[in-house]
UniProtKB/Swiss-Prot annotation:
Subunit structure, interactors included: Part of the 50S ribosomal subunit; part of the 5S rRNA/L5/L18/L25 subcomplex. Contacts the 5S and 23S rRNAs.
Name of the protein in its database record: Large ribosomal subunit protein uL18
Metal-binding recorded as keyword: no
Region: Disordered, residue numbers: 1-20
Lineage start: Bacteria, Pseudomonadati, Chlorobiota, Chlorobiia, Chlorobiales
Amino acid sequence: MSQIDKASRRQKIKDRSRVKVHGTMAKPRLCVYRSLSQIYAQLIDDDNGKTIMAVSSMSKENKALEGTKSEVCTVVGKQLAEMALAKGITTVVFDRNGFRYHGRLKALAEGAREAGLVF
């Protein structure tokens, strides 16, 4: 499968899932983007079109992390969950953004669940 086909396939999956997945202030959308070497996660309130909080593997506190990419993703998930719980957010809607629930995405989700987020 060529790179163009992969990108268009992911975009189709993303568009289909965005119809069903909607975040509010009480239950925001946990949107995850995975690049080749980094991972980015943010909580989004779709009603107001605002990003509530964001964390990534590029953050200052995460740049010095050692280990595999999956281990770093678990730490990022835990950090996001701790920040959300501090703001009083306990439940979220998980938006995998067209990516398969596997590997680094799964590690981030499990880290967030371990830290107390419900989805």
